[in-house]
Amino acid sequence: MARYNPLAFTSGPVVFFITITYTALLIALLLTHLTLPSYPSHPPLGINLTQAWSDLEHITREFHPYNSHANDNVRAYLLSRIEHMMASKKLGSDQVQIIDDNISNATFSSGNTTVYFEGTNLIVAVRGSHDDQAFNDRNRRPDNGGVLVNAHYDSVSSGYGATDDGVGVVSVLQLLSFFTEPKNWPKRTVVLLLNNGEEDFLNGAKAFMRHDISQVPHTFVNLEGAGAGGRAAMFRSTDTHVTRFYRKSEHPFGTVVSGDGFKKGLVRSETDYKVFFEELGLAGLDIAFIEPRAKYHTIEDSTRETSLNSVWHMLSAAIATTSGLAADTSTPDRESHDDAVWFDIFGKVFIVFQLHTFFALCVTLLVVAPLTLIGLAWSLHKADRNYLFARKAFVYSADDDEPIHLYGWRGFFRFPIAFGIATSIVVGLAMMLSAWFAVSWFLLHGADAMRPSALQRMYSLLWLFIGSFCLLVFFTILANNHQVAAGYPSLFCFATVFLANVLSFLELFLAPPKSAYAWNVHQNADGGSRPLTSSATAARSDNRATTDDDATETTSLLSGNRRSFARHDAGRRDAINEGANSQEPESRRRLDLGQPHSGEQEWSGKLPSWIWIVQFSLLAPMIVILVGQIALLLTSALYQTPSDGNSPLYIYTSIAALAVFLVAPIGPFIHRFTHHVPTFLFLLCVATTIYNLVAFPFSEQHKLKVYFVQRVDCDTGVNTVSLTGLDGYVQRIAGNMPSAQQSSLNCSTPDIVTRKELRMCEWEGLHPNVVSPTSQYSNKTRATDWIDYEIFHDDSNNRGRR
C-alpha cells in the first residue's frame, strides 16, 4: 500500500492548505482594517492623551459651524488652551509666535458663486533651530522652509464634528505641546494652523493664504476626518519625498488607490489639501478618517462614536510624519512632484517607491517573463520533455508507426471558459465571492472528472499568466500616460504568476522523454506486458481514457486490438533484443512511470506531487494581501457614496473585479476540491443573495442621506424647498414632508454636474421667519429688506469692492 503524502496534489491536502491559508489571511486583513492599536500607557514626552480627550469633549459639546455662537466659544477655548500651554513651556516668545488672525480675508469666484470670507484662524509658529530669518521676510531662502500642520475647528451644521475635525484639532494642540519641549525642538519651523471655515468652500485655508506666514512652509500635513472613529489613513500625497516620512509611523495605514480614487472624483468632497497643494504649491499629504461614511456629517460624528485609540492613531502618525519633515534639512524642490506608489502591509510595514520605478519594473517584467518561459519551453523541446500541446509521439517515425497519444491539449480551454462564466455571474450578482468559487469548481471539477489531465494546473497557470500580462500592460500604460498608481498589485501578481509558471515548466523536466515514453508504451502493447507503473488500476484507467479519446464516429470497432504483421514482427524483434536493454539508449530502456493521479496521463506518474503547494504559496498570499486590502478600503469608503451622486455601476463593477482577483489564485487548484466546500459556499451564496435582494438597503447604522436646500428669492419672495437624493427614495421622503402635503412635487435631474445620478424634488416651502413678525426690528421679515449693499468701482485702479 502506497504511503500517504500530506503534501500531494490530492483533495485532502489541497482543501486543508488552501482553506487554512485563505482563512488566516482574511482574518488578518479584517483585524487590521476593523480593530485599532491600543494607545500607550506612557506616551512620548510632551503628549498628554487625557488632556487631548478632555479637549475633544469640550469642543464637540455643540454643533459649531462657522459664524455661530458655539463656533466662537470653541475658538475662545482653543486660544485659551494655546496660551495656557505656552505659559508652562520653557521655549521663549522669540521661539514661539501665537497669531490670533482676525484680519486675513478672501474673495473668490467659482462658476455662478462669488464668496467673500473673513478669516478667524488661529496660528502658532514654532521657530526651527535652523531658521534664522523673520517669518515676514519676503526673501526667505528656499532651504529655510517649514512644515505646516493643519486642522479645521468648524463643524457642519448637522454634526458635533468629533472626527471632522475634532480629533485633528486636538492632535494639533498636542503637537504644539510636543514641539515646544526643548528635547523635541524641530530643526525646521513648524506652523500649526487651526483654520475656521473649511466646511464652506475651504474658506479657512484660503484666508490663511493671505497671511505672510503662509510663505514659510514648503511641506504640509493635513489632518481630516470623513467618518467616525476607526483608523486614520494616509489618504493621499503629492510626491514620493514627503510620503517616505509617513513610513516612520508606528501603525501606518493606507494605499495609493485612495489617492487615485480621489483624483478621479470617486469621493465627492474636498479637503484643505486642495488649497495647500494646488494654490500654495506645497508638497504634503492627507491623513484622514475614512469610515464609517454613513456617520460622516451627521449627529453621530461625536465622541461617543470614536475612542482614544482613534485619537492616538492619528496623533502618532502626525508626530512621526511632522518630526521627519521638520528634521529634513534638504533643499525643497517645489517644481518636482514625482508621483508615488505606497501601501501598508497589515498596518505594520509601509512600502513606498516612485511611480517611475513602478513603470520601469513593469516594462522589465513584461519583457523578461515571456522570454524566460519561451526559453524554458525551448529547453523542454530540446530535452524531448515538452508535453504541452503535444498530441502524440512516434516510436520510430510518422511514416510507419501508430501514434502514441500524449493528450497534451487536454484541459487547455477549461480555465478561461470556467473563469469567464464564473466572473460573469459575479458581475451580474454584484456580490458574492462564494458564487465565483462554486461555479468555477462545478465547471473545472466536472471537466476533470470526465477527462482527467495532468496539465490542467499548468494550463490554468498559463492562462493566469496571459491575463495578468494583459492587465499589467494596461496599468503600465495608465501609469505612464495618466500617472495612475492604483495598478501596483498587478506588478506583484504578475511576478508571482510568472514564478509559478516557471515551476511548472521546470516540473516537466522531471517527466520522461516523449520518445522513451512512446517506446515503452509500444513495447508494452506489442509484448503484451503491462506498463511498469505502481498500480495496475492507474494503467487501466489511463488505457480506458485513451480509448475513449481516440474513438470517433469513423473509428473501426476492431481498431483497439488490430495488429499488422509488420508490427507483430517488430514486436518480436524487440522482444528478442530485450535482454540488451542495458546497452541501448535511454529512449529504448524500460521506464518506471510511477503512479499517475487517477485517470491522468501515464507519463505524469513520476512528476513531483508537492510542487503545487509552492506555487500556491507564491500566488495566494501576495494577491490576497494586496487585493484584499484594497477591496476592504474601497468597500468601506465608497459603499455610501451613491447617495452623494456616484454611479453605482462603477462601484459594483470595481467590487466584483476585486472579488474575482481575490479568489483567482485558487483557480489552478480548485478541481482537486471535494464537493463539501463548494456546496457550503453555494448554499451561502443562495441565502445571502436572497437576503440582499429582499432586505431594505438602509438602516440606523447605514443611513440614506439627502441634500436639503431652501431658496428664497429676495426680489420676488418666491420660496422653494428641494430634496436631492437617490431616485425611488427621495420621492417618498419628499412626499412625507408636511410642507409638501399641499404642494405638487416637481422631480427632475439636478443642475449640479456631480449629482446627475440623483433626483431633485422641489415644492413651495414655508416662509422662513428669520425674525419674529411681532418684533420691533425695522425691516421685519420682508425678504427685500434682508440684504442692503452697495458696490463701488474704482476706475483708476480697475478694482471693485463690496
Curated annotation (Swiss-Prot):
Positions bound to Zn(2+) 2: D164, E199, H297
Topological domain ranges for the Cytoplasmic compartment: 1-13, 379-389, 445-457, 512-609, 671-677
Cofactor note: Binds 2 Zn(2+) ions per subunit.
Active site: E198 (proton acceptor)
Subcellular location: Vacuole membrane
Gene Ontology CC: vacuolar membrane
Record's keyword annotation contains Zinc: yes
GO biological process, one term: proteolysis
Vacuolar face of the membrane: 35-357, 410-423, 479-490, 631-649, 699-802
Site (Transition state stabilizer): Y296
Amino acids binding Zn(2+) 1: H152, D164, E224
EC number(s) reported in the record: 3.4.-.-
Membrane topology value: Multi-pass membrane protein
Job of this protein: May be involved in vacuolar sorting and osmoregulation.
Xref: PANTHER family: METALLOPEPTIDASE M28 FAMILY MEMBER (PTHR12147), VACUOLAR MEMBRANE PROTEASE (PTHR12147:SF58)
Family affiliation: Belongs to the peptidase M28 family.
Name of the molecule in the record: Vacuolar membrane protease
